Amino acid sequence: MTAPHRSTIHILGLGAMGTVLAVDLLRFTNALVVPLFRSQERLAQFQKTNGNNISIRKLYLEGSPIFSYPVEKCECPETFSKKPIDNLVVTTKTYQTKEALAPYLPYINKNTNLILIQNGLGVLELLREEIFTDSKNRPHLFQGVISHGVYQDKAGVFNHAGWAGMKIAKLPWTEEEMIQKKSVVEDDAANNSLVKLLTEPKFAKEFGIEHSTYQEMLFGQLFKFLVNACMNPVTAILDCVNGEMKASCGPVFTSIIDECLQILRVAYRPLFQYHEKYSGNEEYPEMDVNAVLTTDNMVSEVTRIGCDINSRNSSSMRQDTLFLRDIEIEYINGYVVKLADNLNLDPNCCKVNKTIGELATMRLALNRSRSINGDWRKD
C-alpha cells in the first residue's frame, strides 16, 4: 500500500507569525514543517532554547492553553539539503526579505510556491525588480494577509491574543494581471499544492483561511495596511498595549487614515474603479472597495479590530521597539510617503504619515539610548 503524499513546507522567519502558522499546520495537517534559520548559530540557539519544539499560548481560549509541537527538521544555509524547495512561507520582517531569501535562491525555481505573510506594502516590487528579475524562472507567488494578533512576551513565549483569520491569493508579477477572474482561484484550489494544503478543511477552519482573487486579497491587504498604519506606530510611540488607547485614539487614526486613502486611491486606481467596471460580470467576484475604505468606516474598524478584538495584544512594532530591534516603518507609513513621491504628489499630502514615521523611529532611538545611558526620568 502506497503511503499518502506528505507535503513539505519551509518557513523562513520563525517569529510571531511564523510560529502561529507553524503550530497550527502541525496541529491540523500532516505536513512536514521545516523552519529555515539565517545561520548555524541561530539554529543552534533555537535548538538549545526550545529543544526543537515550537510553542504558542492561545490567550483567546479558555484557560490560555499552551500548544507545543516538535519539529522533525530544521535547516540553515550551512546545513540545507540543496534540494529544490516546493513550498516556502516567508514571514520575516519586510526589510529582511532580500537578505533572508539570498542563501535559498538557488533552490527556488519556476515550480516553487512562495507565499509572503508580512506587514506592509512594497515587497512585490522588490521581488520583481531586485530578486526574481528573470521573468521565465519566477516562482508561483502568493500573499497572505494575516489578521491574527500575536506577540512575544518578556519570557520569550509567543501569545496568540486575537483570532481574526488570513486571506490568501496568487500575486500577479505584472500590473496587467492585477484583476483576476474567479477561474484563477478555482484552478489553484484544484491544482496548486500550497493552496491545497492551506485550504485543507480542518486547518482552514481553525486558522480562518479565505482563498480569493488578487483584487479581493488586495482589498483585504489595504484594509490591513490601514490597521497597521495606525496600530503599529501609535502603540510603539505611546508604548502601550492596544486596548489602552481605545478611548482616545480616534483623532490621530482619522488623520492617518484620511491621508493614506487619498494616496492609495491614486496608486491603486484599478482597484478603486473595480466596482463600476466589473459589477454584474459573473466571471469576476462582486466587490465594492469604496463602500468600505472610507475614513469614517476604517477608523471604526481599526478601533474594533485593533483595540477591541486584539485589546490584550502588543503590536509587532511596539515589541520591536521594546526589544530594540529595527522597525518596519518604511514599509508601512513610510510606504505611503514613498508612494506620494513616486506619484509626484504634493509633499504636504503625506505629512501626517511622515511625522508618525519619524516619531516611531525616534521612540526606537530613545529606547536604545536608555538601554545604554539609563533612563533620565529616574534621576
UniProtKB/Swiss-Prot annotation:
SS bond partners: none
Family annotation (InterPro entries): 6-PGluconate_DH-like_C_sf, 6PGD_dom2, ApbA, Ketopantoate_reductase, KPA_reductase, KPR_N, NAD(P)-bd_dom_sf
Catalytically driven reaction(s): (R)-pantoate + NADP(+) = 2-dehydropantoate + NADPH + H(+)
Coiled coil residues, start to end: none
Active-site positions on this chain: 224
Cellular component annotations (GO), alphabetically ordered: cytoplasm; mitochondrion
Annotated GO MF terms: 2-dehydropantoate 2-reductase activity; NADP binding
Record: residues binding substrate: 119, 228, 232, 316
EC number, UniProt record: 1.1.1.169
Binding site for NADP(+): 13-18, 119, 328
Origin: domain of life: Eukaryota
Functional pathway: Cofactor biosynthesis; (R)-pantothenate biosynthesis; (R)-pantoate from 3-methyl-2-oxobutanoate: step 2/2
GO BP of this protein: pantothenate biosynthetic process
Keywords: NADP, Oxidoreductase, Pantothenate biosynthesis
Other observations noted: Present with 2600 molecules/cell in log phase SD medium.
Record function comment: Catalyzes the NADPH-dependent reduction of ketopantoate into pantoic acid.
Family (UniProt): Belongs to the ketopantoate reductase family.
Record-given protein name: 2-dehydropantoate 2-reductase
Species the sequence originates in: Saccharomyces cerevisiae (strain ATCC 204508 / S288c) (Baker's yeast)
